[in-house]
Regions:
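Non-catalytic signal-transmission and effector/linker regions of two-component phosphorelay proteins
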Residues: 1-18, 115, 125-140
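Acidic, metal-coordinating helix/loop segments flanking the phosphotransfer/catalytic sites
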Residues: 46-67
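Acidic catalytic/metal-coordinating carboxylates
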Residues: 47, 78-81
Length: 140
């Protein structure tokens, strides 16, 4: 009886979607991990370079990342540059996270160019973020 439960959990775990979170604020990375890991496999990185390296690593193993939550203002590079580099590697869905008031023209250009799906403003409302993640992964 226990074996069938383990198998069911394994199947459920393997069907879990993977979210990569890139933010240079470690407290936010921890918050995202704690909030999201009950529903998703969560990978956290604290720099644009680490983000790109992680995506390359997953791609080399033929493993899929389903969504990237990407901070706009990273310590080493801006999020829009990371988004451009990511799109050269993989057609990954990206939600941009920012505490800054981004110009609507910049946001619209990023969306029209297919670099990001949408922008989520900090401070992040976790329930709204959860809904946005579900919609984005589902392709809505």
């Amino acid at each position: 009886m226990m074996a069938s439960q383990d198998t069911k959990e394994d199947v459920q775990h393997s069907a879990q979607k993977t979210i990569l979170v890139c933010d240079d604020e470690t407290d936010l990375l921890l918050m995202f991990r704690i909030y999201l890991e009950s529903q998703y496999k969560v990978i956290t990185v604290d720099s644009g370079e680490s983000c790109i390296d992680t995506i390359l690593d997953y791609k080399s193993k033929n493993e899929e990342i389903d969504l990237l939550l990407l901070d706009y203002k990273l310590g080493d590079i801006s999020g829009d540059i990371v988004a451009r580099k990511v799109k050269e590697i993989d057609d990954l869905k990206i939600l941009m996270i920012t505490a800054f008031e981004l110009d609507n023209q910049i946001v619209n250009e990023l969306i029209q160019q297919g670099l990001i799906v949408d922008v989520v403003k900090k401070p992040v409302q976790l329930e709204q973020l959860s809904q946005k993640i579900k919609e984005t992964i589902a392709g809505q």
